[in-house]
Structure formats: structure tokens, C-alpha cells
Amino acid sequence: MYDVAAIEAVFAQARQRQSSLSLLMLSTADGRSIAEASSLDADGRRIAAMANSFLTLGETVSRELKLSEADYATICTRMGNVVLIRIAAARPMTLTAVGRSELNLAVLLFHARECAQRLLPLLDARTP
């Protein structure tokens, strides 16, 4: 079991530091949502499943091209951007970060990576 309150506190801190983050979600590598902080009208369970599939596809393409391991995957639109990061915890996790259109991709990526680093110790210290 994960400390959902601690995970949500990391999300709240990230969203306080960058108010243009419209969604932060942590999900298992098989696409089940663990925790989310969102101002979007979206089904978190569906987003978790699709985000993990998209990131897994990016990782597979990277392997097929004989590139290094994929660090993240992105989706860029006029309405905002999405960054998907695999967190290499004891059990791999997916962090989904969505930024509104005024937040450029580089800044979104910075905040998503920082959030992933803050989550890692919480994920490795799971409660039985």
C-alpha cells in the first residue's frame, strides 16, 4: 500500500510552485491510478491506463531503434502539453503531468522530473 496522503502532498507542493500544472497523476505500470491532483474534467482511471500504454509504446520504440532507455514521453497540443515519466521505484510507476497552454514544455518537464524525484523515496518506502 502507498502513502496516498504523502503522494498528494508532493502533488500539492508541485502545483503550488507551478500553478499552470492542471494534472499530476501517479499510476502503476499496469495503468491503475494511485493518486491524482487535477483541475481537469477527466476520468482518472482511463487517463492512467492510456498514459501508461503511451509511455510503454515510447519505451518500446526507443528499444527497437536501439536508442538508450526512454526517459519520458510527451504529447504537445495548442491547449497544453503532457509529460509522462517512468519512475524506477521498487515497482515501476508512471507520473503523468499536464500543463496548461501558458506553461511551455521545458518548464513542464522540469516540474515533472522534480515531482518524480520527490515521489521516489515515498514509493520505495511502501507500507506492507
Predicted regions: what they are:
Residues 1-29, 33-128:
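Non-catalytic interaction/Regulatory regions outside core domains
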